[in-house]
Amino acid sequence: MMIRIASAVLSLAGLLALVSGIAFWSGIGLNLLALHMLLGLLAVGALWTIGIGQAFSSSGSWIIAASALILGILTIAIGLYQSSLLVGALHWVIEVVHLTLGILTIGLGHMGAVRYRKSTAGSR
């Protein structure tokens, strides 16, 4: 049940973070930064919950769990410090890296959730 809730939180927070980030990036929602950061933290927290939770299932993967932890740390770190990284003409590179990490966060979380559901399907 916890993985199912975390998966729903990941979907909702991840999608809203993606939309608010693109709005912020395009200059539309400059006041959405705090909301975007909160949604990103929720998405990463859900990723970590799913990653660690699926690792303890019968056919869980500790590689997925470790990848979830590393990806979450990278996503948060790049998000928090991106305004001071590659300042100038190449700043778009950091923005694309952060966007890519966010999309990977959603994808890896759902991959872990599906793995968990498949491993526990017979025990219901």
Which residues make up each language-model segment?
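Polytopic transmembrane helical bundles with strong interfacial aromatic enrichment
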Residues: 1-124
